[in-house]
């Protein structure tokens, strides 16, 4: 019955797409707006002037800030993705602006001009300082303990591209923007809707102009790895379009025509030489198409479908060669994109849409949420719903939508075969971005995956597990250098090139986070706990958990009274350097419990299990403070008026 229902829905999607405006996509689970978007952010790295891109005066540090300069993109665009490529649909009438991403397009890494040694030799040899720090704690010299930690538990790697050339840590960077001029004017436009259908993982733009109903459909297929964009109307000959592409402005490349209706852009990032390829092909019904000067010009067509795909030469590596600058290079994007595009065009729009829906629905439709199905609300634009909700009006549908939007975003940004969701999932509109749009290991990447297994999306957890595997070998060097410890760990920020060291800053409230690795490793057990995949635990998961637990044991301070505490430690982005931050103890407890249970499941490592149990039994317990609160630090300095956004110590609950 489920398969029959799925077939019916997918058939309805395909058939309704034949006639522009034939389906009300605002029904069901949908985020939608009733006013068109601005075009002001177009090619934001040049202030909306892509025509200025001449390969000179490249904005190397553009976006080196915590603020996105394109507010409409951030709050009004429609995000679609398949775990590898992503796009944001802006939905203007005069032109369609689409920001485009491929998740592995990163600056930085070992292949910059200064090579592999420059990239990897960043860990300080600081393990011998731990005894001195712990002695300072014992003697009550908090200032000395903090000073020694600040001076010795950072690295020499800046977090800002403006402060280092070549930039080692790097950043996730845009693959550019597509711009489709329509020849239409907003004057006289009516019935506008810009819709993100969570039921079908499709973005739709609909409006009427001069008694013509126009419709644009967008989806990104995971099976085909292609972005599909369909421009149609309910009258023939109404598609007059000019398609152009503004590439990443800190790369060097060239656009060539591919036949009468295709474009291929091949380039390499200036920072590290990472190669990437973008392919576009237009298929029209009626009218004419001219392919000239890097633009596709369509006149008088009934319908236009654009097929787009992209790839980089990045290769994930679980055992990187620290001497080889190209240890993360291994894919030919010319070949991969050529095959993907040829296959997609051969299938055609309807078959791709059906395949896309079947693939997506198999994940999304596993969970339904009905908070109060007897209470009905009107079909309002999402912005109006939010305004009403903030005024105190109940809206159970909005709450259901919010829940399912989280699941949708995870499906769109995390599928097997690529990197996990980053700070912005898979979506980015600039050269650089807030916090390098990296992998923040002090709660952000973990938060991305909280709904994975618990909402029946365990497959979406696999990219995170593969990402953790890429950190192990570099993380062993970090664990040994800073703590003289077995196993592996990571620090606050990671990239796709195995970066596990702390950064340059001496602000230890955020830059000192050795529990990042064990916290990541707890997700390994979570995946097993939900799936009960014993083969996975035996062949992949257990060693990751075991080595992380061993790091946690070696990192702890075994005090003369027999107890274990975390010194030095911090509560992420908040408060002083401590000798027993609750967050750290909570993660240690969790990873030790995971290791104990995993070893019992497999019937292995009785000796290590005994050690883990002994440490767990003697770990300093949680403390209750003067307000009846769970203390965040080893001393009772919590302030009930403190509204800091990080409350990581609550992990213990």
Predicted regions and their residues:
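Bacterial Sec-dependent N-terminal signal peptides
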Residues: 1-22
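Short linear Ser/Thr-Pro motifs
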Residues: 6, 15-16, 221, 569-572
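Aromatic-residue-lined binding/catalytic grooves and analogous aromatic/hydrophobic interfacial grooves
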Residues: 21-508, 526, 546, 550, ...
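Extended, hydrophobic alpha-helical segments in both membrane/secreted and soluble proteins
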Residues: 444, 513-527, 540-554
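Short loop-to-helix capping motifs
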Residues: 533-534
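Acidic/histidine-rich catalytic neighborhood
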Residues: 547, 551-601
């Amino acid at each position: 019955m489920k398969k029959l229902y799925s077939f019916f829905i997918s058939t309805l999607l395909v058939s309704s797409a034949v006639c522009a405006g034939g389906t009300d996509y605002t029904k069901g689970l949908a985020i939608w707006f009733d006013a068109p978007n601005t075009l002001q952010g177009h090619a934001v790295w040049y202030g909306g002037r892509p025509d200025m891109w001449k390969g000179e005066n490249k904005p190397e540090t553009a976006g080196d800030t915590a603020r996105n300069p394109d507010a409409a993109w951030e709050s009004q665009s429609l995000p679609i993705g398949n775990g590898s490529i992503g796009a944001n649909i802006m939905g203007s009438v005069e032109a369609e602006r689409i920001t485009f991403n491929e998740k592995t397009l990163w600056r930085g890494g070992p292949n910059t001009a200064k090579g592999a040694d420059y990239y990897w030799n960043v860990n300080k040899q600081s393990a011998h300082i731990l005894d001195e720090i712990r002695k300072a704690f014992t003697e009550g010299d908090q200032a000395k303990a903090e000073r020694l930690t600040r001076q010795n538990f950072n690295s020499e790697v800046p977090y800002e591209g403006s402060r280092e050339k070549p930039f080692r840590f790097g950043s996730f960077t845009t693959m550019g923007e597509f711009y489709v001029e329509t020849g239409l004017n907003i004057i006289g436009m009516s019935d506008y809707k810009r819709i993100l259908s969570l039921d079908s993982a499709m973005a739709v733009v609909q409006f009427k102009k001069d008694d013509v109903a126009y419709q644009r459909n967008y989806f990104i297929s995971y099976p085909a790895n292609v972005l599909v964009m369909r421009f149609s109307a309910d009258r023939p000959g109404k598609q007059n379009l000019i398609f152009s592409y503004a590439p990443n402005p800190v790369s060097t490349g060239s656009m060539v025509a591919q036949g009468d209706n295709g474009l291929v852009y091949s380039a390499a990032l200036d920072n590290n030489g990472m190669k990437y390829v973008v392919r576009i092909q237009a298929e029209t019904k009626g009218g004419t198409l001219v392919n000239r000067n890097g633009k596709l010009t369509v006149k008088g067509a009934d319908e236009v479908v654009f097929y787009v795909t992209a790839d980089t030469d990045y290769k994930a590596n679980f055992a990187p060669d620290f001497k080889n600058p190209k240890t993360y290079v291994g894919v030919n994007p010319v070949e991969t994109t050529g095959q993907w595009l040829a296959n997609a065009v051969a299938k055609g729009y309807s078959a791709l849409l059906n395949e896309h829906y079947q693939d997506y629905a198999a994940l999304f439709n596993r969970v339904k949420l009905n908070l109060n199905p007897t209470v009905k609300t009107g079909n309002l634009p999402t912005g109006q719903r939010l305004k009403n909700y903030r005024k105190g009006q109940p809206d159970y549908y909005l709450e259901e939508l919010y829940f399912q939007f989280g699941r949708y975003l995870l499906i769109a940004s995390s599928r097997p075969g690529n990197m996990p969701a980053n700070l912005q999932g898979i979506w980015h509109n600039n050269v650089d971005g807030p916090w390098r749009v990296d992998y923040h290991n002090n709660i952000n990447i973990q938060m991305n995956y909280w709904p994975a297994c618990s909402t029946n999306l365990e497959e979406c957890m696999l990219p995170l597990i593969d990402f953790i595997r890429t950190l192990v070998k570099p993380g062993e060097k970090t664990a040994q250098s800073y703590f003289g410890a077995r196993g592996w760990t990571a620090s606050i920020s990671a990239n796709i090139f195995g970066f596990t060291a702390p950064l340059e800053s001496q602000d230890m409230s955020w830059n000192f986070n050795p529990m990042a690795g064990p916290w990541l490793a707890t997700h390994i057990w979570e995946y097993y706990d939900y799936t009960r995949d014993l083969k996975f635990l035996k062949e992949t998961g257990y060693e990751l958990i075991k080595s992380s637990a061993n790091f946690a044991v070696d990192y702890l301070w075994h005090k003369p009274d027999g107890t274990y505490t975390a010194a030095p430690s911090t509560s992420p982005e908040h408060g002083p350097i401590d000798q027993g931050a609750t967050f750290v103890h909570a993660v240690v407890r969790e990873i030790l419990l995971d290791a104990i249970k995993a070893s019992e499941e497999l019937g292995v490592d009785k000796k290590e299990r005994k050690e883990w149990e002994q440490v767990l039994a003697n770990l300093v317990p949680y403390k209750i403070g003067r307000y009846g609160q769970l203390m965040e630090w080893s001393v009772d300095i919590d302030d009930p008026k403190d509204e800091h956004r990080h409350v990581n110590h609550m992990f213990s609950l």
